[in-house]
Design a protein with these regions (language model features):
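C-type cytochrome heme-c attachment and multiheme electron-transfer modules
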Residues: 1-119, 128-352
Length: 352
């Protein structure tokens, strides 16, 4: 009973709020003249903000217009990469993708009123509208497989991100609302937006003045910050429709495939798409699977000031196990992974 109360209980204070005074039917429709539940619920809209043009736009026209093309609304990144893998078979694969892979598409309400179904669903606070989404109850619903557990230190044996544990920062400390609400630009993946977030926004002044840390002087911006400052993070493997995937902690350095980011080496995370991910629904659904790596650049949210890699040069130099090498690739992996492997491990440095 307690769970159901949390899911559906509407706080009396909500009824006198700006949204509450509009009345339930103004967003949820149904039949407000009926006294019987079955009649009252005819035509009921469970998530009105899924139709933001109708419900949210009259009062929030600019945000509603921008949100339609936002990555949170379109989850376009999945489609962008799957199109490349599917090639000529995309038209056949698209309806399967729409049915199976866009569950983390988010509506306005999934941040401001309720939890996303993938996070258990239910109202956040008695139907009160949260102007600033409570990140512990919303962001983690969709980003709970990797980002959220990393940030809060929920992977066994791995510490929380120092920005959370020491400074009590949250998602909004780095990520601007434009990343969530959109900018009216129909981005094909999330990278143009998250590329605007940089460690140098806060740490750049010291770095540019000339750090006393030798690694900063030697490597400059050739290395993504996380290469030296990340803890272990999870990679996912073998995702199949209807069966899910498995995951494991990992740490691999590889070559960056994004010139706009400005560094040569980045951390890589294994993503779960395999050649036969859609085999139960469509045979040979990904004929161009080899064109896209399944070791992808990543920015783990588990930053540590001190790690075993930044204690000495030889935390990385000569330490082959932390670099993605050819022998790390599985037999069925895409050939495009050869673009991100590190062919030559930096040699161990001798003490002077």
């Amino acid at each position: 009973v307690g769970d159901r109360v949390e899911l559906y209980w509407v706080s009396p204070t909500y009824l006198t709020s700006k949204h509450g005074l509009l009345g339930c039917p103004s967003c949820h429709e149904g039949d407000p003249s009926a006294w019987e539940k079955s009649r009252a619920h005819r035509g009921l809209i469970k998530d009105p903000s899924a139709e933001a043009d109708r419900t949210c736009s009259p009062c929030h026209p600019e945000i509603a217009a921008r949100y339609k093309t936002s990555i949170h609304a379109t989850v376009k990144g999945y489609e962008t990469v799957l199109k490349k893998r599917a090639g000529a078979r995309w038209m056949e694969l698209e309806p399967i993708y729409q049915e199976s892979c866009v569950g983390c598409h988010a509506t306005c309400g999934h941040c401001h009123i309720s939890r996303h179904p993938s996070g258990g669903g239910g109202l956040i606070s008695g139907h009160q509208f949260a102007r600033r989404a409570p990140v512990d109850k919303t962001c983690g619903s969709c980003h709970g497989g990797r980002v959220s557990p990393e940030f809060y230190g929920r992977h066994e044996g791995q510490p929380a991100d120092v920005h959370f544990s020491k400074a009590e920062m949250d998602c909004f400390s780095c990520h601007d609302p434009s990343e969530f609400h959109g900018t009216k630009t129909p981005y094909q993946d999330r990278y143009p937006l998250i590329s605007k977030v940089s460690c140098l926004d806060c740490h750049g002044e010291d770095f540019q003045r000339g750090s006393q840390i030798e690694a900063h002087q030697v490597h400059g911006r050739d290395l993504q910050c996380q290469v030296c400052h990340s803890a272990l993070y999870k990679g996912c493997y073998e995702c199949h429709i209807g069966k899910g995937s498995r995951s494991q902690l990992q740490f691999k350095i590889g070559k960056s495939q994004r010139p706009d980011q400005g560094y040569r080496y980045t951390l890589l995370r294994h993503i779960p798409t395999v050649r036969d991910s859609f085999e139960s629904k469509l045979k040979d659904a990904l004929p161009d699977y080899d064109l896209v790596p399944n070791w992808k650049g990543t920015s783990p949210h588990n930053i540590q000031r001190v790690t075993y890699r930044n204690q000495t040069c030889n935390g990385c130099h000569g330490n082959a196990r932390i670099f993605l090498r050819k022998e790390d690739l599985a037999p069925g992996d895409p050939r495009a992974n050869e673009q991100v492997i590190v062919p030559r491990i930096p040699p161990k440095r001798e003490a002077k």
